[in-house]
Amino acid sequence: AKLDSEPGPKESPVKAAIKGMGMLFVNISFWIILLYFATSSLPGWATKNWLPTLFSENLSIDMSEAGPLSTFTIAISSFIGVIAGGILSDKWIQRNVRGRIYTGSIGLALTIPALLLLGFGDSFAMIVGGGLCFGIGFGIFDANNMPILCQFVSPRYRATAYGIMNMTGVFAGAIITKLLGESTDAGNL
């Protein structure tokens, strides 16, 4: 049986892709979600890419210790955040259609004090605690991106929309990583 979301027999895949992107780019909700996702990618990629350097310099430990410490800190706390964020939003959406949006916002809100702790912390507990808080918050946020997208984008265009979101997030991450690297090399960070 043909799914409703499959292109018709006379519609080429290229035409279907162009039509799908056209449908997304006229959807104001998609643009808002894209901006929300791209903006949050800046601290997300910056933290994940620069955390080993931050740990090494601020905690005076070798990179051979800072790399695994930062990876475990972010990975374990993000896993906890994904599980907690998924459970919370699944329960909240049953009472309020905006539950997933609110849950994702709570996750992003947790990243703010985390970034302050990471940036201004002067002890092991503060800096690693900031990393843990960031991971939990970003995990909560990340667990809800696709479900939020599903609330605003037709099933027919969701894969394209999510692909564009991911591409935009990676581009934002590349830009911030380059800027932070240049700033570090210039002695401004």
Predicted regions and their residues:
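A late C-terminal transmembrane helix in Major Facilitator Superfamily
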Residues: 82, 152-187
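Flexible cytoplasmic inter-helical loops of multi-pass small-molecule transporters
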Residues: 1-19
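Interfacial helix-cap and linker-helix signal at transmembrane-aqueous boundaries
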Residues: 55-56, 88-89, 93, 180-188
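A membrane-interface helix-boundary motif in multi-pass transporters
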Residues: 62-65, 99-102, 182-189
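Extracytoplasmic gate region of multi-pass secondary transporters
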Residues: 22-83, 138-146, 173-177
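Cytoplasmic membrane-interface "Motif A"-like loop-to-helix N-cap segments
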Residues: 90-107
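Hydrophobic core of transmembrane alpha-helices in multi-pass small-molecule transporters
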Residues: 124-140
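C-terminal ends and interior cores of transmembrane alpha-helices
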Residues: 108-122
